[in-house]
Protein backbone atom coordinates (compact mmCIF):
# COMPACT_ATOMS: atom_id res chain seq x y z
CA UNK A 1 0.00 0.00 0.00
CA UNK A 2 1.25 3.50 -0.77
CA UNK A 3 1.54 6.46 1.58
CA UNK A 4 -1.49 8.08 3.18
CA UNK A 5 -3.29 10.82 1.28
CA UNK A 6 -2.42 14.34 2.37
CA UNK A 7 -4.74 16.38 4.56
CA UNK A 8 -6.18 18.36 1.64
CA UNK A 9 -7.20 15.18 -0.17
CA UNK A 10 -8.77 13.74 2.98
CA UNK A 11 -10.67 16.99 3.48
CA UNK A 12 -11.97 16.86 -0.11
CA UNK A 13 -13.13 13.27 0.26
CA UNK A 14 -14.44 13.37 3.84
CA UNK A 15 -13.96 16.19 6.33
CA UNK A 16 -15.09 19.22 4.34
CA UNK A 17 -17.23 17.45 1.72
CA UNK A 18 -20.94 18.12 2.12
CA UNK A 19 -24.19 16.56 0.92
CA UNK A 20 -25.34 19.07 -1.66
CA UNK A 21 -28.93 20.23 -2.10
CA UNK A 22 -28.29 22.77 -4.87
CA UNK A 23 -25.92 22.91 -7.81
CA UNK A 24 -24.45 25.54 -10.11
CA UNK A 25 -25.94 25.66 -13.58
CA UNK A 26 -22.84 24.01 -14.99
CA UNK A 27 -23.16 20.81 -17.03
CA UNK A 28 -21.12 17.70 -16.27
CA UNK A 29 -19.74 16.19 -19.45
CA UNK A 30 -20.16 12.57 -20.48
CA UNK A 31 -16.37 12.35 -20.50
CA UNK A 32 -16.26 13.21 -16.78
CA UNK A 33 -19.01 10.68 -16.04
CA UNK A 34 -17.12 7.99 -17.94
CA UNK A 35 -13.98 8.89 -15.98
CA UNK A 36 -16.04 8.58 -12.81
CA UNK A 37 -17.13 5.05 -13.68
CA UNK A 38 -13.56 4.10 -14.59
CA UNK A 39 -12.64 4.84 -10.96
CA UNK A 40 -15.72 3.24 -9.39
CA UNK A 41 -15.22 -0.09 -11.14
CA UNK A 42 -11.98 -0.73 -9.24
CA UNK A 43 -13.62 -0.69 -5.80
CA UNK A 44 -13.78 -4.15 -4.20
CA UNK A 45 -16.90 -6.31 -4.27
CA UNK A 46 -17.47 -9.93 -3.23
CA UNK A 47 -15.99 -12.28 -5.85
CA UNK A 48 -15.38 -9.18 -7.99
CA UNK A 49 -19.08 -9.41 -8.78
CA UNK A 50 -19.62 -5.72 -9.57
CA UNK A 51 -23.43 -5.97 -9.51
CA UNK A 52 -24.08 -2.21 -9.57
CA UNK A 53 -25.62 -0.66 -12.65
CA UNK A 54 -25.66 3.10 -13.09
CA UNK A 55 -28.00 5.28 -15.12
CA UNK A 56 -26.71 8.84 -15.54
CA UNK A 57 -29.88 10.86 -16.03
CA UNK A 58 -28.95 14.13 -17.72
CA UNK A 59 -31.57 14.73 -20.42
CA UNK A 60 -34.90 16.51 -20.09
CA UNK A 61 -36.62 13.30 -21.18
CA UNK A 62 -34.80 11.27 -18.54
CA UNK A 63 -35.66 13.76 -15.81
CA UNK A 64 -39.32 13.76 -16.93
CA UNK A 65 -39.40 9.96 -16.59
CA UNK A 66 -37.81 10.18 -13.16
CA UNK A 67 -40.03 12.97 -11.82
CA UNK A 68 -43.16 10.88 -10.96
CA UNK A 69 -41.05 8.68 -8.67
CA UNK A 70 -39.57 11.51 -6.61
CA UNK A 71 -40.81 12.49 -3.18
CA UNK A 72 -42.07 16.06 -2.87
CA UNK A 73 -39.04 17.12 -0.86
CA UNK A 74 -36.55 15.77 -3.40
CA UNK A 75 -38.23 16.70 -6.69
CA UNK A 76 -37.05 20.28 -7.23
CA UNK A 77 -33.40 19.71 -6.38
CA UNK A 78 -33.25 16.51 -8.42
CA UNK A 79 -34.82 18.04 -11.50
CA UNK A 80 -32.41 20.99 -11.24
CA UNK A 81 -29.25 18.91 -10.72
CA UNK A 82 -27.04 18.52 -13.80
CA UNK A 83 -26.89 14.74 -13.25
CA UNK A 84 -28.95 12.29 -11.25
CA UNK A 85 -27.43 8.83 -10.98
CA UNK A 86 -29.75 5.91 -10.45
CA UNK A 87 -27.63 3.49 -8.43
CA UNK A 88 -29.09 0.06 -9.12
CA UNK A 89 -28.01 -3.57 -8.99
CA UNK A 90 -28.41 -6.52 -11.32
CA UNK A 91 -29.92 -9.49 -9.51
CA UNK A 92 -28.55 -11.72 -12.27
CA UNK A 93 -25.01 -10.39 -11.77
CA UNK A 94 -23.73 -13.95 -11.48
CA UNK A 95 -24.03 -14.43 -15.24
CA UNK A 96 -20.90 -12.28 -15.66
CA UNK A 97 -18.84 -14.07 -13.00
CA UNK A 98 -17.08 -16.46 -15.41
CA UNK A 99 -15.49 -13.32 -16.90
CA UNK A 100 -15.14 -11.25 -13.72
CA UNK A 101 -13.93 -14.03 -11.39
CA UNK A 102 -12.21 -16.72 -13.50
CA UNK A 103 -10.29 -18.15 -10.52
CA UNK A 104 -13.20 -20.36 -9.45
CA UNK A 105 -16.67 -21.42 -10.56
CA UNK A 106 -18.21 -18.46 -8.74
CA UNK A 107 -21.32 -18.47 -10.91
CA UNK A 108 -22.39 -21.74 -9.31
CA UNK A 109 -22.35 -20.07 -5.87
CA UNK A 110 -25.30 -17.93 -6.94
CA UNK A 111 -27.23 -20.27 -9.24
CA UNK A 112 -30.79 -20.94 -8.20
CA UNK A 113 -33.71 -18.63 -7.49
CA UNK A 114 -33.04 -14.92 -7.98
CA UNK A 115 -34.17 -14.17 -4.42
CA UNK A 116 -31.17 -16.11 -3.14
CA UNK A 117 -28.67 -13.72 -4.71
CA UNK A 118 -30.66 -10.49 -4.28
CA UNK A 119 -29.04 -9.81 -0.89
CA UNK A 120 -25.53 -10.05 -2.34
CA UNK A 121 -26.50 -7.85 -5.29
CA UNK A 122 -27.94 -5.23 -2.92
CA UNK A 123 -25.00 -5.30 -0.50
CA UNK A 124 -22.27 -5.08 -3.12
CA UNK A 125 -24.21 -2.63 -5.28
CA UNK A 126 -24.52 -0.40 -2.21
CA UNK A 127 -20.75 -0.55 -1.77
CA UNK A 128 -20.32 0.55 -5.36
CA UNK A 129 -22.74 3.41 -4.83
CA UNK A 130 -20.55 4.61 -1.95
CA UNK A 131 -17.49 4.34 -4.18
CA UNK A 132 -19.33 6.52 -6.70
CA UNK A 133 -19.78 9.29 -4.13
CA UNK A 134 -16.11 9.23 -3.15
CA UNK A 135 -14.93 9.03 -6.77
CA UNK A 136 -17.13 12.00 -7.64
CA UNK A 137 -15.57 14.02 -4.83
CA UNK A 138 -12.09 12.95 -5.96
CA UNK A 139 -12.87 14.35 -9.43
CA UNK A 140 -14.04 17.69 -8.03
CA UNK A 141 -17.76 16.97 -8.24
CA UNK A 142 -20.24 17.34 -5.40
CA UNK A 143 -22.81 14.69 -4.54
CA UNK A 144 -26.26 14.62 -2.97
CA UNK A 145 -27.28 11.01 -2.26
CA UNK A 146 -30.88 10.28 -1.29
CA UNK A 147 -33.49 7.58 -0.94
CA UNK A 148 -36.69 9.62 -1.01
CA UNK A 149 -38.30 8.11 -4.08
CA UNK A 150 -40.54 5.26 -5.22
CA UNK A 151 -38.30 2.37 -6.26
CA UNK A 152 -41.08 0.54 -8.07
CA UNK A 153 -41.77 3.58 -10.27
CA UNK A 154 -38.08 4.01 -11.08
CA UNK A 155 -37.78 0.33 -11.92
CA UNK A 156 -40.82 0.49 -14.20
CA UNK A 157 -39.53 3.60 -15.97
CA UNK A 158 -35.90 2.58 -16.41
CA UNK A 159 -35.53 -1.18 -15.89
CA UNK A 160 -38.80 -2.77 -17.01
CA UNK A 161 -38.42 -6.41 -18.00
CA UNK A 162 -34.92 -6.71 -16.54
CA UNK A 163 -33.45 -8.15 -13.31
CA UNK A 164 -32.12 -4.70 -12.40
CA UNK A 165 -33.49 -2.99 -9.28
CA UNK A 166 -32.94 0.59 -8.13
CA UNK A 167 -31.29 1.21 -4.76
CA UNK A 168 -30.75 4.96 -4.29
CA UNK A 169 -30.21 8.20 -6.21
CA UNK A 170 -27.22 10.54 -6.25
CA UNK A 171 -27.41 14.07 -7.62
CA UNK A 172 -24.08 15.19 -9.07
CA UNK A 173 -22.67 18.52 -10.17
CA UNK A 174 -20.81 21.51 -8.81
CA UNK A 175 -22.41 22.42 -5.51
CA UNK A 176 -23.94 25.76 -4.63
CA UNK A 177 -23.07 26.49 -0.98
CA UNK A 178 -26.26 28.53 -0.63
CA UNK A 179 -28.22 25.27 -0.58
CA UNK A 180 -26.32 23.73 2.33
CA UNK A 181 -27.81 23.09 5.75
CA UNK A 182 -25.61 23.86 8.77
CA UNK A 183 -23.07 21.09 9.30
CA UNK A 184 -24.60 18.28 11.38
CA UNK A 185 -22.63 16.43 14.06
CA UNK A 186 -21.33 12.89 13.76
CA UNK A 187 -21.05 10.18 16.38
CA UNK A 188 -17.73 9.97 18.21
CA UNK A 189 -15.55 6.89 17.96
CA UNK A 190 -16.70 5.71 21.39
CA UNK A 191 -20.35 6.05 20.37
CA UNK A 192 -19.99 4.13 17.11
CA UNK A 193 -17.05 1.76 17.50
CA UNK A 194 -15.22 -0.43 19.96
CA UNK A 195 -12.23 -2.71 20.26
CA UNK A 196 -12.58 -6.41 21.11
Curated annotation (Swiss-Prot):
Keywords: Flavoprotein, FMN, NAD, NADP, Oxidoreductase. The keyword Membrane does not apply. The keyword Hydrolase does not apply. GO terms for molecular function: oxidoreductase activity. Its cofactor is FMN. It holds the Pfam family Nitroreductase. Its EC number is 1.-.-.-. PANTHER family: MALONIC SEMIALDEHYDE REDUCTASE RUTE-RELATED. Belongs to the nitroreductase family. HadB/RutE subfamily. HAMAP family: Oxidoreductase_RutE_HadB (MF_01204). This is Putative NADH dehydrogenase/NAD(P)H nitroreductase XOO4023. It comes from Xanthomonas oryzae pv. oryzae (strain MAFF 311018).
Amino acid sequence: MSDSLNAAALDQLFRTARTQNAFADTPVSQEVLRELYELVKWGPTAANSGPARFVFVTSADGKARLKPALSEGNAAKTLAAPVTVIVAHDEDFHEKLPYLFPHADAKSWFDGPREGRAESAFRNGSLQGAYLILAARALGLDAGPMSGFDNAKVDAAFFAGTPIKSNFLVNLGYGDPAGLFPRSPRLSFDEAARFE
